[in-house]
Amino acid sequence: MSLTIAVAGKGGTGKTTLSALMIRCLRERGLTPILAVDADPNANLGEALDLSADLSIGQLQSETLKQVHSLPAGVPLSRHLEYELHQAIVEGEEVDLLMMGHGEGPGCYCAVNHILRRYLESLRSSYRCTILDNEAGMEHLSRRVSHGIDLLVIVSDASPTALRSAGRIAGIADDLELEIRRRCLVLTNLRGELSDRAIAELEKTGLEVVGRIPFDQEVAELRLADRPIDDLSSEAVSLTEVSEMLDRLLQKEEAA
């Protein structure tokens, strides 16, 4: 069984940290290989995983659009692009990274988009788990992954602003008509109880809260030191909470 989890949230809420923590927990459970897809133009998932990508899908698309009419005779566009796409995958130990980069501009080419979507959907089937770290607008999710999303995890901190954004993200997912089997909310960087305003905004989202992750000083220090998530101690409070949350989610997936 292949599992695809998409993570989305307002910038600064900790969605990339959550994605990296989930990847670590999945790897520790032996649910490998894992494909980590950084679909946020402000890409930093690779840094959290200690993987470095020099080439993004956005860059490949731009280059292909420039070359599409000058390919050698007898070389199909699909073969050329799929070869280049394979070069963009950064292979790690049990975890591979693919960076989406910036979305296409006005030079959009439908044949290229079709090949990209087909390739990415085929690629996911080669992995036990795929984690998609998305930007709030989920542009890449809508353009590149049309189906097969098992779980959409929307991330928010305790601020009313972030919770309103979480509700809007859920609405965007509806508007895009994405095939998502289940969606939920994870609260991050918690320091005590939610305010009355935050509770009101939370209720408006209509989302099930599946995780409440407290502020973790060790994670904060890790980020300041520019160190990967694997350097986090096994006793870290955030890792413990994400591990327990993931167990609950996986149990529900198995029962579905």
Model-derived features with residue positions:
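Walker A/P-loop phosphate-binding motif and the immediately C-terminal alpha-helix
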Residues: L3-P41
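Active-site signature of alpha/beta-hydrolase-fold catalytic machinery across serine-
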Residues: L21, C25, A48, R144
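N-terminal phosphate/diphosphate-binding loop that engages ATP/GTP or pyrophosphate donors
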Residues: E28-E91
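Short, hinge-like loop/turn segments at secondary-structure boundaries
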Residues: L51-L55, I172-A173, A200-K204, P228-D230
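Beta-strand->loop->alpha-helix junctions that form or flank phosphate-binding loops
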Residues: G58-Q59, V210-D216
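Cytosolic-facing regulatory segments adjacent to core modules
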Residues: R79-Q87, E91-G92, D96-L132
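Conserved catalytic-core segment of NTP-binding enzymes
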Residues: A111-R212, E221
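C-terminal boundary of histidine-terminating zinc-finger modules
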Residues: A225-A236
